[in-house]
Amino acid sequence: MRIAQEEIFGPTTSLLRVTSFEEAVRVANGIEYGLSCAIFTRDVNQAFRAMRDLQTGITYINAGTTGAEVHLPFGGTKATGNGHREAGQAALDVFTEWKSIYVDYSGKLQRAQIDNVES
């Protein structure tokens, strides 16, 4: 199915008929993309299996994939995205660079902090 092989952005809804949960997971995971997916179920065990088995950056349970939740790390798997999570706390590592600075105003030569030899 072409619809299950392309990454679609836009106001599109695709419905595919499958005969089992396992087939649905195979279809969803059988493409090269993995940005997001959604499953609607009243079965909590099925929801947890979906969370475990679906190969996407974000899995929605009983909610549509209308966009990333800004408080959650957002990004895809496989051929989707750029390999980074672009929201939530994980965005700090994507959009910032750590820099450590040590300043000593004592004017004295300091022993290394790992030097435990008595003077």
Regions found by a protein language model. Name each.
Residues M1-S119:
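Conserved C-terminal structural/oligomerization subdomain of aldehyde/semialdehyde dehydrogenase
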